[in-house]
């Protein structure tokens, strides 16, 4: 199967390169009868859009999304929805210098080994620019899930470098350029990013995504488990190197009687499981964490080779993010929404109704 | 799509419950012409098989696998391969006591919410017993990949509780009951497990899986990336709560110039990426780590409710593993083999050959 | 994707060769809560089973089916259902003579070109023996659809050679060895088959399948249309060379005002469309016709070549059906049931419920 | 899975309605390294394009196709290819009169039953306008197959009404407005169509598609057989009611010794099978026939009901084809190309190379 689709009943297929004519996608499986407009999608596209502060690349992307099909008189028809976002403000010439080089940490080397050639302009298809359509598709899923059963999917920056942010206030998240929920971290984050900018370096981050009001029963064991599909979707985001559900790697040193979530007639007493038991949602909030590596394009020179095997030293400045993890918040929300939407539809299909 | 299949060109579909008549699977997509026998599969099934030491459940499972189709005169024919493993030594009566209870940490609650009922005997389909067929399927993939391009897939215990094991000696891994590569950890692990057994508790673990000689080019961006499919496959293993590729969560506090793997004419100077760049294998060893939670069935009593909402205190002794992570080593190897096999075939299909 | 699966939400995967150890399958996607027993499946297996008359091969196949999983206390659990049918009464030695020959009309040649080798015993995987599991899977779908919304799926022989049978009496269908609904054809059919048997020849047939009480709305345009999926499923039956929906090829010479089915407040005035409009069920009976070629193994000698290219004349007697179309009736019913079941679940998943 | 995709390794996904903003698609799985331009696609789009004669609807569709991604420096990159065709010349107001009516023979009724509403403008998604993208996708597959192994896929009109056309001259096909290969039929066809136009009626047709130089071995039994996938793809074309492979329905009255294709050291002596044995290509030309119903929109009045159940008489003139079968030739060629391309890649993936 082509690698550019995700989901079964709710299926998102995308195309587009960093410096191509446009990015686009087809969203298949949206039930008919839901009000939907381009504005519904633009909200999250704007949250993802860089250029709003010094913390992310100054490259200005006017990501205006167009819905080309699947809507009639303002309502979804149940047919496939075509999405289009034109590319603008491209400085392809910036990339001439790396056309024959493999930028360490980037996909240049592996793409060329796989395809025998590559679109070197801004990383081509391997650029995070591709996530624009993921965010638009996720916005459709978010809206459906909210209308249909009140599911609320939100994310925030949990850590940048050594600075850990606690979930103190959801309202704070949209009020600072870091998607940070912890007002006490803002100054430290500000200093960290300013210093990194000064020295032309970048840093990794941890993002947490939480879905509330998820009904119990979502997930199709033994392979299409909800946690497994979330891991797939989240790991498919550029720069993600790790995924956790609930306590994640902390379970390694936990004892059996510490880890299990006890149950009372009032519900669960804890949520170490992150809302998923045996690959199926339990009705508790679904919690996932992801680790994003630092951008590889920094001012520090490094060693690499050309397509012809010659060793060279390069400095890949470009106009890149100091912390790609920040922009990953709306992207990760979108991927969780896409997975939950798909499983919501699958669960409805398989529900019991025969005696 | 049914949730009991994994893979596209190399597709594994399974059935069977902990205490049903049998476990089985269908392996579709094995290329014709490879010598294959039941013995090839039995090796890994025995490695997974409990009962060989006090560290894992004394339940004796004689997991003899039968190949029912797809082989003619000792060679694969290219048609689907049917596998069967009969269930024996079942003590279903042991589970009468929990037929109306939800065991905390188990899938009892979520399965019943999803399906409206459940096979309570040993967890039914949610039992790790289901992984028997995964291991058999993985053995087929391992053999193909080894023959075809010398890929070698091996795993080991990297941590149990607070005891971290270093990869000092691959040969040591198969010589101790922990799949531990670090002889200096054996005594500590022995004491830890003995104490947990004495107090009837369990503990989590970390398992590392490494695939060597993986050719560059495996992975189908932007969604069926190699890292994303590995995350899906590994997270689908019972008790797994986290997956890392390469440096994983350590990247959060790394700087851009630390994380990227520099390249020379002799190859990469490091492997922070875990052998995957942009979702495509780079030719370096593919490295993944998983976190497994402690078994939830321990002697410490805990609170739960019945199907009817009544609160009760239970002790779910049964005959369970002290550290399920140990048995997860051959299972995780199998899942990585299944994913690499699928991507090896997919990559071959898409290779360039037109000018 | 492996070629041995069909369906998305209701997914049937099979294995097994004509003379292998066993045939089996995995049925994934059966909703939980339906009473199901091996007897429910055996009924159709017996209808398909040869040996009940001279009209079909004397080979006695005792197709006892075993359900190995997915049922608990007599009810489906929503997990995958494993099926097994053992092979018996094999006369593999009968096939030694053709191990190096390509039987014209059989798949010997194409299988060997594809796989580089073949299991020559009774055609191996290409044998109609494989349809045993399709019939068992179809029986599950039939039962679900009948319970869930009263859908009734039945087939009959519409033509053998030049003898056309009219649908005069459904009850007659199960009372003669031809699945013929037209009592006035029985004698002619009897004579035809006896003569063919005498001269060791075979004949083609046409089978009609009708599903009643199919709710309007099944089918997922523009590719997974109900008619397209039926065409796929029916054409996948051994020896089928043509598929029609409704009037089929008769539409070629129809005028626009003849073909369209007019509508009144009482419903449609005709059913030229065969119950499908724009790829979606209209609520009228779904009608399909298939053409089956005559068995290629007959007493008349014919020319062929060996694997080594040598020309030879062969007579492939074996113990084969005079009219394979007869046995195809329950198989075609099963394939229609599998498709309708899949689309019933898919339609439920996509139904509108948001404003 | 969403119903708007077809194929596994070569996957075509489409969107767009008759009177929406645009039609588009994503072609996933095109191997890298093939030269490809918009002109390569435009050729077939023009062949499909109406308005070139009185025989087809005067509606002028300027189907200029844009490739938005997947090509770099004139060559495919192996990433997904985005296609876009803008809609123009729309007379939506023409359809106001039928907004509350179900046009007999059209999908109005079934779409509304399924989705609870419909885009009534020109049939919305159910319009044959949707096939524009299929033709563009097919053109990519045709080019690849021609370059890669000389496969040549061509179609022609085999029958309109009672007028049967013989394959006398391939060159003639592109030289008349009927795609007719039989110069002796042209006058009769001309008179037939002129009369139908005069009386405002329409007629059915039969189209034959032949693929030459298809290598032996394409097809994945037992369900994803080449013939089964062709039946699926061809039956998914608007107005198609029947599909035949090789002799098709003629096999019903054939004897076993007539139907089988004998083999000599020079190859097969006949091609009753249509180039497919056991669901796998035999190396002979692959031959398929399809039956297309007459357009339902004609000047003759007919009975129908409104959405509210009121009986009315309608005349759905519009600007429609007298024989939709004519335009179906390039569409059917495209669908066969899409299926062969997918199976070519799948076969390459599964080929034997291990001992």
Swiss-Prot record, chains A, B, C, D:
Record-linked InterPro entries: Chorismate_synth, Chorismate_synth_AroC_sf, Chorismate_synthase_CS
CDD domains cross-referenced by the UniProt entry: Chorismate_synthase (cd07304)
Stretches of the chain forming a coiled coil according to its record: none
An example Gene Ontology molecular-function term: chorismate synthase activity
GO biological process: amino acid biosynthetic process; aromatic amino acid family biosynthetic process; chorismate biosynthetic process
Keyword rRNA-binding carried by entry: no
Protein name: Chorismate synthase
GO-annotated cellular components: cytosol
Cofactor-binding details, from the entry: Reduced FMN (FMNH(2)).
HAMAP family according to UniProt: Chorismate_synth
Lineage: Bacteria, Pseudomonadati, Pseudomonadota, Gammaproteobacteria, Candidatus Palibaumannia
Cofactor list: FMNH2
Keyword terms: Amino-acid biosynthesis, Aromatic amino acid biosynthesis, FAD, Flavoprotein, FMN, Lyase, NADP
UniProt-annotated binding residues for FMN: 125-127, 238-239, 278, 293-297, 319
Organism: Baumannia cicadellinicola subsp. Homalodisca coagulata
UniProt similarity note: Belongs to the chorismate synthase family.
Catalysed reaction equations from the record: 5-O-(1-carboxyvinyl)-3-phosphoshikimate = chorismate + phosphate
Pathway: Metabolic intermediate biosynthesis; chorismate biosynthesis; chorismate from D-erythrose 4-phosphate and phosphoenolpyruvate: step 7/7
Quaternary structure, from the entry: Homotetramer.
NCBIfam families: aroC, PRK05382.1
Pfam families reported in the protein's UniProt record: Chorismate_synt
Described purpose of this protein according to its UniProt entry: This reaction introduces a second double bond into the aromatic ring system.
Chain residues that bind NADP(+): 48
Gene behind this protein: aroC
